[in-house]
Amino acid sequence: MGGVRAVAALAFAGVVGLTFLVLGCALPRYGTWTPMFVITFYVLSPVPLLIARRFQEDMTGTNACIELALFITTGIVISAFALPIVLAHAGTIANSACFLVNTGSVIMFGTIIAYFYLHRDDDSGSWSQSLF
């Protein structure tokens, strides 16, 4: 039953994160949907690590493939937080909309991290190899 609760908690956290994102766009006070582009970063953030885990070589010491994937993932995550800040600085969105979108990003990326943490021991071939 613990697995069902974990999946339900992850789903709820994802819904809360997306709710903050939609609130930052849809409230009449803000009136612009440009922060919705952050969803692109949510989708792209796990891709480099998934690819790196799939093609990981057995090497002693550090692994360049994993390090490159972590670097690219870090760039994607920072871009997800930077986009609303740049839009707010340019005057495209309000500062409060930027706060709502970045709050949603914190929750969504926390959900993505929790998903990979909870499913790290699944027996699915090389996809289940630990990254850290």
Curated annotation (Swiss-Prot):
The chain crosses the membrane at residues 7-27, 32-52, 68-88, 98-118. Keywords: Endosome, Membrane, Protein transport, Transmembrane, Transmembrane helix, Transport. The keyword Plastid does not apply. It is a multi-pass membrane protein. It holds the Pfam family Vps55. Coiled coil: none annotated. It comes from the Eukaryota. InterPro entries: Vps55/LEPROT. GO terms for biological process: late endosome to vacuole transport via multivesicular body sorting pathway; protein transport. It is found in: Endosome membrane. GO terms for cellular component: endosome; endosome membrane. Involved in endosomal protein transport. Belongs to the OB-RGRP/VPS55 family. This is Vacuolar protein sorting-associated protein 55 homolog.
